[in-house]
């Protein structure tokens, strides 16, 4: 039985809710074909985010980890391709920390690629009628910080990891200015992604690039 650890961030900024946390709560304990989902709540705090997930990994000993965060402006579930070694926070984190152009890990590589089968994940999510696409930027806030930090932590292990950004919930954009997705659809997309990880030891060959 392969455990898939899926983490969700707490609310941050002016939001009272974070769809990442709410979605993972909905699928906590879900049984998969050959696996199960376990979850972890993550603080939107620079170094505490990494330490929290590291502790969950040590406790759960998962086969793979999906770290999840919200991304305003996105209309689809978007597995991230790459994490970069830069913290450049546009807003403070939840403890008031706001850093500019500092490394996530001093002396670390410029970037890490995901070790999840992101194209297979996207394909399986799309097959169920849920919008999904590969993303080539995880930003420079705590989402990318966590993505990079956990990739660095797991680099010499067989534990697979990657980050997935998800849209806002309808209640987070009552004026309709931002694309949204229903909570149940987000949760189901994450569960499908978890199953795709179990089913695919390597990624599929399928175009997912962009011009810019």
Curated annotation (Swiss-Prot):
rRNA-binding found in the keyword field: no
Pfam families attached to this UniProt entry: Peptidase_C15 (PF01470)
Keywords for this protein: Cytoplasm, Hydrolase, Protease, Thiol protease
UniProt subcellular location: Cytoplasm
Gene3D superfamilies: Peptidase C15, pyroglutamyl peptidase I-like
One GO location term (cellular component): cytosol
Catalytic activity entry: Release of an N-terminal pyroglutamyl group from a polypeptide, the second amino acid generally not being Pro
Keyword Cytoplasm (UniProt): yes
UniProt-recorded Gene Ontology molecular function terms: pyroglutamyl-peptidase activity
Enzyme Commission number(s) from the entry: 3.4.19.3
Active-site residue numbers: 80, 143, 165
GO BP term, pick one: proteolysis
Family membership: Belongs to the peptidase C15 family.
Function: Removes 5-oxoproline from various penultimate amino acid residues except L-proline.
PANTHER family found in the cross-reference section: PROTEASE FAMILY C15 PYROGLUTAMYL-PEPTIDASE I-RELATED (PTHR23402), PYROGLUTAMYL-PEPTIDASE I (PTHR23402:SF1)
NCBIfam families given in the database record: PRK13197.1, pyro_pdase
Self-association state and partner proteins as the record states: Homotetramer.
Descriptive protein name: Pyrrolidone-carboxylate peptidase
Gene source species: Aliivibrio fischeri (strain ATCC 700601 / ES114)
Source lineage: Bacteria, Pseudomonadati, Pseudomonadota, Gammaproteobacteria, Vibrionales
């Amino acid at each position: 039985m392969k455990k898939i650890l899926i983490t969700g961030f707490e609310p941050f900024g002016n939001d009272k809710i974070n769809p990442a946390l709410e979605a993972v709560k909905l699928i906590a304990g879900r049984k998969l074909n050959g696996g199960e989902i376990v979850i972890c709540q993550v603080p939107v705090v620079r170094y505490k985010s990494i330490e929290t997930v590291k502790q969950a990994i040590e406790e759960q000993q998962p086969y793979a980890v999906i770290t999840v965060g919200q991304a305003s402006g996105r209309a689809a579930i978007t597995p991230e391709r790459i994490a970069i070694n830069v913290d450049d926070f546009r807003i403070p984190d939840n403890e008031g920390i706001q850093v500019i152009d500092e490394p996530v890990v001093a002396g670390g590589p410029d970037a890490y690629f995901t070790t999840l089968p992101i194209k297979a994940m996207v394909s399986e999510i799309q097959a169920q009628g849920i919008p999904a696409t590969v993303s080539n930027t995880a930003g420079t806030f705590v989402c990318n910080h966590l993505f990079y930090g956990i990739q660095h932590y797991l680099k010499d292990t067989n534990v697979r990891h990657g980050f997935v950004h998800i849209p806002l919930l309808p209640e987070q954009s009552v004026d309709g200015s931002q694309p949204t997705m229903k909570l149940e659809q987000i949760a189901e997309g994450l569960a499908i992604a978890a199953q795709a990880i179990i089913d695919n030891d390597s990624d599929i060959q399928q175009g997912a690039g962009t011009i810019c």
